[in-house]
């Protein structure tokens, strides 16, 4: 009898897991309740982990693999007729006011190139070169450039993966899935009063992960981190080829087609699922942007987006089977790396669910670090 798989949560991670299961001819049902504030839907992602100052090797392995996997994923999606992914390799600018910091970033890039040739060309840019590449930056700054940097629209690439999975006979249900336990074993889920049975259940519900596991009397240490992002409309609509920009103080800017410019972001802990966009966050992000790109004061404010990143205590994603319920797999805690890591980790999660070899060492991302029995 053919194994049945259920994926609960169709953000970028769950959509990827479903797609890769479907690519391997598995029978998959994807269930998502489409919560307001899901991280994937508001995320505009910069794919350029190689110049990050984060030193954790387990995190960097995932981020490096995630960035390298994107071209293969985009090719697979195109083969399945999905072209509107919001992904483009446009290069990345790492901006700083201090020359010394730029030299440190480039030295790190040179060290990492051997294992990550997808970094592409790296070099230091003059003030004039920066303005030529990204005309809105008019203040004198220094920059390290990596030609392999890319940007992606979280909503679009996730929708493309869902569409592709459905074309491969995956089923999609919008609804609230509750895990069902019989005789100490998870037999499936209940959605709208109907029980759907499965052999393997994958839980990828992000910031809502703890809620999903409540029927199992387990407590997952994952919390929502509120992110707010400005979406601006520029007069020039020829913006799709502008490089992504990363600057100090968690400022980033990335442009899409037709003059859309995203400016982010905030990292707000202990706000719960507060969906309100706040003037304080808008002011904070705008002021940071104006310091390097003062002409953005004349841009039109289109929207202030709000979403919730799933964060775990040590900020390293977790993946694995629940020790107490071996047919339930969980992956979570991608934080602000979700768009870089999500598609690749979803592929690995699908392999794990099917008993196939994984590239990652799951011991480096132990689920047991964040799971506790409820008292």
Put a short name on every predicted segment:
Residues 6-8, 196-208, 346:
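Short hydrophobic core segments
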Residues 150, 171-187:
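A conserved short coil-to-beta-strand element within the FAD-binding core of flavoproteins
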Residues 61-65, 95-104, 144-163, 276-281, ...:
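Short beta-strand to alpha-helix junction loop
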Residues 16-24, 31-33, 46, 82-87, ...:
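Active-site substrate-recognition segment that forms the wall
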Residues 295-375:
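C-terminal catalytic lobe of FAD-dependent flavoproteins
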Residues 82-94, 111, 118-168, 266-270, ...:
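Helix-loop-beta segment of a Rossmann-like dinucleotide-binding subdomain
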Residues 1-11:
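Beta1/beta-strand and adjacent pyrophosphate-binding region of the FAD-binding site
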Residues 46-129, 288-290:
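Dinucleotide-binding Rossmann-like beta1-alpha1 core, especially the glycine-rich loop
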């Amino acid at each position: 009898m053919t194994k049945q798989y259920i994926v609960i949560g169709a953000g970028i991670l769950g959509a990827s897991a479903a797609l890769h299961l479907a690519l391997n001819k598995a029978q998959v049902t994807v269930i998502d309740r489409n919560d307001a504030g899901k991280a994937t839907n508001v995320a505009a992602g910069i794919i350029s982990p190689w110049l990050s100052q984060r030193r954790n090797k387990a995190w960097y392995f995932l981020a490096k693999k995630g960035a390298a996997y994107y071209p293969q994923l985009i090719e697979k999606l195109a083969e399945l007729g999905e072209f509107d992914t919001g992904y483009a390799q446009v290069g990345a600018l790492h901006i700083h006011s201090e020359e010394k910091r730029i030299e440190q970033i480039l030295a790190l890039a040179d060290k990492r190139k051997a294992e990550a040739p997808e970094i592409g060309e790296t070099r230091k840019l003059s003030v004039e070169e920066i303005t030529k590449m990204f005309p809105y930056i008019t203040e004198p700054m220094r920059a390290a450039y990596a030609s392999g940097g890319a940007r992606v629209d979280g909503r679009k690439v996730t929708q493309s993966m869902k569409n592709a999975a459905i074309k491969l006979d995956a089923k999609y249900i919008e609804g609230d899935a509750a895990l069902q336990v019989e005789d100490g074993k998870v037999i499936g889920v209940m959605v709208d009063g109907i029980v759907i049975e499965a052999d393997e259940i994958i839980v990828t519900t992000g910031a809502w992960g703890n809620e999903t596991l409540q029927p199992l009397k387990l407590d997952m240490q994952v919390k929502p981190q509120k992110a707010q992002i400005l979406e601006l409309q520029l007069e020039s609509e020829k913006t799709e080829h502008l490089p992504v920009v990363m600057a100090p103080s968690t400022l980033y800017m990335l442009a899409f087609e037709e003059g859309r410019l995203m400016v982010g972001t905030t990292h707000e802990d202990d706000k719960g699922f507060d969906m309100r966009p706040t003037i304080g966050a808008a002011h904070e992000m705008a002021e940071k942007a104006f310091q390097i790109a003062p002409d953005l004061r004349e841009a039109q404010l289109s929207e202030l987006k709000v979403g919730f990143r799933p964060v775990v205590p040590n900020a390293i994603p977790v993946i694995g089977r629940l020790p107490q319920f071996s047919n339930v797999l969980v992956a979570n805690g991608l934080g602000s790396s979700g768009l870089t890591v999500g598609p690749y980790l979803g592929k690995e999660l699908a392999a794990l669910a099917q008993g196939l070899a994984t590239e990652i060492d799951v011991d480096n991302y132990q689920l047991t670090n964040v799971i506790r029995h409820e008292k």
